[in-house]
């Protein structure tokens, strides 16, 4: 996040998606999903605390008005999924890799005879 690695991903999302809506604030100032560094794997005792601390992230997500939320990694996907479920946010969460896969040209493999 802090080294600008997501800039290339943003370029791709802008190319691949019809209407990309950036969260505000964004980039290195974006609010954390609360699952960073694998914190989500600390388990149920910490989930309640994570959800209380995720209220602003929930509001940030809702302000976009988007239908789909793109998660850059598995930890973020799980953290965002928890937020969406806990607060009843009507939004689908997809992995960035799934977005790429959806728009890829696919050929069906057929064994040569």
Predicted regions and their residues:
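Iron-sulfur cluster-binding electron-transfer modules in prokaryotic oxidoreductases
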Residues: 1-113
